[in-house]
């Protein structure tokens, strides 16, 4: 199952991008034998600053056809890392070819796009900068792959 992180805004070269690249490389390497990956980051940018509706339209264009649509939103469900791994395995095992994890812009995700989501995940009630959410999500993808592989990376 291919994984796409769809995000509003551009991430500049720096420590956050290095961390994301590292975790996604690890995910690809670990997930390959599990039917997970490759992972990619797709950035969309509303250059006209037309708001959440315009961002949602750009995100919809970037969605792979037939993908599981999972938003990252403070109103979403909080999952443990093993629960996230199980959810990913479940989507993979039902034959889904693509998973799209969507990170909104500064104002969040347009309500119409949130309503279309198959699932929504929250990293807690706090609001996080999009660059940190990308890092946290990339790490959780790698952690999920190691959990499914039985690797000792995730310790309880």
From Swiss-Prot:
S-adenosyl-L-methionine binds at residues 72, 104, 123-128. It is an enzyme of class 2 (transferase). The keyword Transferase applies. GO terms for cellular component: cytoplasm. Gene3D superfamilies: 3.40.1280.10. Its EC number is 2.1.1.177. It holds the Pfam family SPOUT_MTase. It catalyses: pseudouridine(1915) in 23S rRNA + S-adenosyl-L-methionine = N(3)-methylpseudouridine(1915) in 23S rRNA + S-adenosyl-L-homocysteine + H(+). It is found in: Cytoplasm. Keywords: Cytoplasm, Methyltransferase, rRNA processing, S-adenosyl-L-methionine, Transferase. Belongs to the RNA methyltransferase RlmH family. Homodimer. Specifically methylates the pseudouridine at position 1915 (m3Psi1915) in 23S rRNA. This is Ribosomal RNA large subunit methyltransferase H. It comes from Ruegeria pomeroyi (strain ATCC 700808 / DSM 15171 / DSS-3).
